Each structure stands twice: as C-alpha cells, then as structure tokens.
C-alpha cells in the first residue's frame, strides 16, 4: 500500500490554549468542516468528539490529548487536542514535542491568560511555529485589537494579523482577508459551511489598508528581494505575501493572527487555509536530534520515507476494547503492522500487533505507517512515554522528554479486600499513561500514596479508578512533597568495621558535603587517588549516599541539591566488601548532613489571582496570611491581577475561600515554580508533627 498523502502535504498540529478559550469547540468545527463528524459535538452538552473521557464530558475540560486525522484541500492534518488546565501541562509538553506547528487559541474577551503564557513558553522551548486564532468574536466585550496588544506585551511576540474582524459581539459577521483584500461573510443558514467573498465594506476600508500595510511591511522584512521591491514602491503579489508570511512563521519572527467564532461557525475555514499555507510540513522543520546508542555520538534524523524506521512514543492510553495504545510520531521510514520494532531506550524488541489511525475515539486499522504520521501502536508491552522505537541495525535514541516531580501527595485506601488487589493494577496502568503521576508506598505506615501536579490532577485519577477500573477508594488529606537540603559545607569520616572472628566487614571513607544551586540536583565526585579505596567499591559509596538521601535527617524527606566528594579512606584485603562501603557511605552522609545546617524546603507555587478592584485588599491580605510574597499587580480588562509566590501547603481549599471572599467573581490559577526554604518556626512544627 503506497503512501496516500505526500510528506510535504502533511501537517502535524496541536491546538493549544487557556481553559475556556474555546479550544475543543475549535477542534470540533475543524472535524465538522473537514467532513469527519456529521453532528457537531458541543462542549456545552458534553458530546464533543475530542473530549472522549467521561470526566472530560462532565467537567467540560480536555484532559488527554486525542490525536485525530482529517483532510482539507488535498492535505492531511493530524490534529492533537491539548488540555488547557495547569495541572495537565505535562500533556501539553508531551504533545509539543511531537508537533510541527500549533494553533494558539485565545478568547477575544479574556485575552492572554496565565495558562496561555505557560503553553506559549513550552512552544518556544520546543521551537514550534504557531498561528494565533482569536476566538469568541461574538461574545460581549470581544476585542481583537486588545488581544493583539496583549500578545505583544505579555508574550513578547510579534503578532501580524492576516485577517481582521467585520463587526464584533452580536454584529460579528465575517472577516477581511488582508492577503486577498476581500471580505468573507459567513452564511448562518448552512451553519457556516458556505460563505460569500465580497468587497470590503467602505467603513472598514481605511482600517483594512492600515493593517494590510503592516502585513506587507512584516513580510518584506523576511527577504531582501521582497524588501527591495517594497521600498521601491512596487506591489507584492499574493504568492509573495504568502511566501513571506510562511517564512516568518517558520523562523518564528512573526505570528500570523486570525479571528473568528468557532461556536457560531465563523472563521474556521480561513483558519484551516492558514494551517496549510503557513504551518510547516514535516520536511520543513529542523532535523530531530538523537544519539547513537553504540557510540553515544549526536546524530540527526531527517524526516523522510527513505531510511530506516524511527519514531517517538509520546503517549500511552488504555483503551477498553483494544488494550494499551501507544501513540507514536514517525520521523523516518515506514513500518508495517505485524512487524518487530526495537526500543532503543530500553534495549528491547517488541512486536507491533496492529496499527490504528485514530479519529478521536473511533479507530481505523491501517497496514503501514509512514514518516510524518501520528499513529497508535497496539501490542507493545515495555514501551513508555518518551521511548524511541526504531530499526535495530540503525539504532538511534531521540532526545528524552523531561517530566516534573509531583508536588502533592494523597493517601489512597481501598475500601475492601477485593479493591486492594484491583487498585495496585489500576494505579500501575495509570502511572504508565501519565509520567507526572507517581505511586509509592509510605514505609512507616504501609499506606499507598499517589503524587501529582495539583489537586485536580489527583481528583481525576481517583475518579478514573472508580469509573474505568471499578475500584472504590477512600482518600486522605493532601500532603505536600517537602524536601531537605543543606546550607553549609562539612567534611566527615566514617569507619564501618565489624571484625570479631570469621569474615568481617570493613569500609572506611572520608567525604566532603557541599550545598549546590537550587534545582541542580545531586552530584558525586570521586577524588580517590593511589588506590586507597579500590575502584570496584566506589560505586557502592555513591549508592549508599543515594539510598540515605531518600530519608533526610530533619524529618525523613528526600535531600536535594548537594555535592559529595569522596576524597580519602582505607580498606581491608579480606573484610572489605561492597556492602561495607555502602554502609560507610550512608553513615558518613547522615553524620555530615546533621552538621551541615540542614533546612526544610517546600514547593512554592506561582499564583495569579484575577479580582474586581473592590476585593483587591481582602485578597492581598489573605495571600499575606498564607505566607505569600506579592510580586506584581496589574490591570487587565477592568480587573486587578495579583501575582504572588505562595507555599503550596497554604493553598489547600483556596478556591472555596476565594469564591466566598469575592462572591464568586475572583478566579485564580497556580503552577509549581520552585522550592523555597520553610521559615524555622513553621519547619519546627512540621518536623515535630512528622516525628510525632
């Protein structure tokens, strides 16, 4: 079976936005106009095709990025719907990794919200070109030009409108296409499927000319030949303008900007045209960096059908009918269903039972998959998110994705003995799907703890236990993931010796313990010379320290951000062993930690609160009571915006308190920012309670 769509006519795009900007509705309309869904799914009635998990239907937010394939004007668009809630940034980060381009949806009233900034930063990090769609132009307070300004100020980007609205709020009827200099007016009777191309209304002609001039100027800057033409007063052709917009979009010096109202079926076709015209094909993005596992040298994977198969697993889902689905972005070559692939990250071979093209949650079996495609593999046992799948003879490891550590834990207790067994299996499956979700057992109590990125994240996990796995569980109070670190440098020696007849134990080490920059992690340096400790025992010292650092000396929390230098020691020909050096390393570390001024760290959250002015004083007072540090105060659309760092431990139940303090008019968002030192009086309480 030959490839149906040439590689240069494929677009892998994500739709990313703040919660409630209308992202799922936009995806739905794309599927409707490209002929995939016959009845448009509305988020309001919980029937959206993309939002297919039960919880998403209830909450009306998108949780897992469903990958869907659709066609528009001889192009294949692989659409990845990404969640807009802060607790799910891991999903967004994952999909950014495998996209070639993105559509950023903004609400014409709300503009640039905190989550939009996070998603924008992630797209910058992965170098993803994007176009902006200003949605909800029919809403009261809609203002396209306000959003344009906010993108400049808050996102430090260069938005270049390629169409501008005709009317706003209930008079919004269409857009002016600045490339063609025509008005496009949608027909309400056909649910926006038909539209008329007309002359620009006379009252908007001046504005259209002004914005067309800005567009042409931005385009001319992309190319010397175009610049000369522009400065010489010559008209640029439509083709030249399109070429210039695409060049600027791909090098990220400009962001094409469009508007519409997905809910009212206006502006979606022009958005699809822009996706095809301006976002990159897999052949137009930079080659993917990888490492040759044999030589550890850097290699580059070029997107093409030639060459051996290489792809990246970027998402795992459990499907009630098919079992485990592994979503893979194919970068090079092709693969047939039923064949074997090599997982170069795990050094294991796996058989691909079936290949599925996904349409939201309907599926189509395909025989083979080609470069540039996104496809679900069935039958992989050992592959996890971030693993590379490739041809064994031409192995490559594509760059890994980084996943954040959980900042919040909750104890879960199964209600019955039968639930106990099912719960272990279910949590294991959920942890495979979501690398930012962790499961652990608390040693002292034997309780199962689940960890994640926020309260909503864990609520949804518990909810899925109930619905998908039929496990009833009680949940405890949320617990914060504290850490410990040291503030001063100390040198210590420890001799571990048991020599009373028979085979003894002997390990003797000198270590230096030093604090490191926040967030820099653990470092072990071996400075042993002259063989005072044999080479084979040195990893044991490191291992002993790594085990001991899981339980800090203050309150048993993991110790972070420090460096250990092993610089001296001694050994015994007969009695020394790896075990003895492991114990010596562990004891030396514990003694050194006690003397190195240990302190407790807590997760600090970046909190942004939006409130009407009259509640501002109360909100700031409340944040101060929660040990918050206020960073800035801004105005946005008649509301006051307060930015602060607040300890996570003080933020439990904040949504309820904020609602009652502002009569339901305040909203907030928070995301983990960094670990900060706990004030000594509070640290003392935490330590006593923990040791209680």
Swiss-Prot record:
GO biological process terms, semicolon-separated: ribosome disassembly
Major location (coarse): cytoplasm
Keywords for the protein's UniProt record, in alphabetical order: Cytoplasm, Elongation factor, GTP-binding, Nucleotide-binding, Protein biosynthesis
PROSITE patterns in the record: G_TR_1 (PS00301), G_TR_2 (PS51722)
UniProt xrefs under Pfam families: EFG_C, EFG_III, EFG_IV, GTP_EFTU, GTP_EFTU_D2
Protein family according to the UniProt entry: Belongs to the TRAFAC class translation factor GTPase superfamily. Classic translation factor GTPase family. EF-G/EF-2 subfamily.
Compartmental location: Cytoplasm
Start and end residues of each tr-type G domain: 8-283
GO cellular component terms, A-Z: cytoplasm
GO molecular function, one term: GTPase activity
NCBIfam families: EF-G (TIGR00484), PRK12740.1-3 (NF009379), PRK12740.1-5 (NF009381), small_GTP (TIGR00231)
InterPro entries: EFG_II, EFG_III, EFG_III/V, EFG_IV, EFG_V, EFG_V-like, EFTu-like_2, G_TR_CS
Organism: Helicobacter pylori (strain ATCC 700392 / 26695)
Sites where the protein binds GTP: 17-24, 81-85, 135-138
Its job: Catalyzes the GTP-dependent ribosomal translocation step during translation elongation. During this step, the ribosome changes from the pre-translocational (PRE) to the post-translocational (POST) state as the newly formed A-site-bound peptidyl-tRNA and P-site-bound deacylated tRNA move to the P and E sites, respectively. Catalyzes the coordinated movement of the two tRNA molecules, the mRNA and conformational changes in the ribosome.
Name recorded for this polypeptide: Elongation factor G
